[in-house]
Amino acid sequence: MSDLRFLTFEDLDQIAVEFGTPCFVYDEKTLRANAQAVSQFPNAFGLLPRYAMKSAPTAAILRIFNQEGLGIDASSVFEVERAIRAGYGTEMISLSTQELSDDFRYWAQDGVKVNLCSLNQIHTFGKWKRNERVGLRFNPGMGSGGTNRTNVGGPASSFGIWKDDLRHALDLCKEYGLVVERIHTHIGSGSDPEVWKKVASMSLDLAREFPSVDTLNLGGGYKVARMPDEKATDLQEIGAPVAKLFEEFAEETGRELKLEIEPGTFLLAHACSLVTQVQDVTSTGPEGYRFLKLNAGMTEILRPSLYGAQHPIHIVPEPAQAKFRELTDQVVVGHCCESGDLLTPAPGDPEALLPRSLLRGEIGDFCVIEGTGAYCSSMSAKNYNSFPEAAEALKKLSGTVALMRKRQTFEQIVENEVAP
């Protein structure tokens, strides 16, 4: 049990009895420590970390980060509403969205800071309200990420206004009297300090074209190391040269820009474990594999099936049995009727099975999947095969575990269906 980040067997037993499995369990101590770490990101003239709430939008998490002084990065008007319901003031919320639905008008006039992410969005916003203060999101022409699917910059990404459309964006803002006070860029999920320094420099060049800009948002994408062979982002290492660039920009222009960042994975990944149980075991013979079938899968954690992402997996038998279990190569799969519901793919290749050396699992054992705080509960194949959404719980600073989101009922799955 010493291998688990923050759970004990007693915790697992309590969770299974009180909430059932599968269940996402978040750790308040880790959440608060990570929030305090991002608040120490090097900066020259002021910093506001904004939580990328798409990574895990449950209200209890939002309330913790609000208490820690983090702002909100929302990716839809629906996330804006969830943040407000969780207690956030509109002045602490920034909206950068692929789909600028009509509802943005309501939130924009109520104080939410809107970043316009395309030339069409500038046109749409400008027609609605002239002479307004806005932000612009640009694609600086390069990106960084573990896979193409987590890279949100460069010519293969649709996010943001393409860098070569700068003049067109300037002209549109002038046409509608829009005052650009924020420049936003975001390149993806990487950890190379030189890449961050280069993107910061390119972003400052964009800010130079807008004399009214007082804030530069460099987005998030701070990689965490879920597995032993992965490299995590050192915030101090990537932030120090960026702060120096801000100082040089101030010396050159007389403008002291505030910095915003938008961490999601950094805050959440290691702050949650998915508690599941082995519900079946099967083998395909000496030339095949030993499969552990869980009572969870892509309905809770889609990242392995989508990216070939790797997560630490622990088989946790009753303590009295653990010493009699040997390490065995096993493939861990989910409960969906879908061949791609695979939890141990080859790194970066969701098509390939890769057995993992784990304690030999048996039916009824707990299986704890770690590193599941970000883009798991919020980004899964919800209700596939009509499985209900899993419960979510919080291990509080006191050590007690409390429910923060109920398991979905079958009635809730079908409640919106009507007879045509």
Model-inferred region functions:
Residues 31, 54, 76, 107, ...:
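Conserved, mostly hydrophobic/aromatic
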Residues 256-420:
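Charged (often Lys/Glu-rich) extended helix/loop segments that serve as interaction or gating elements
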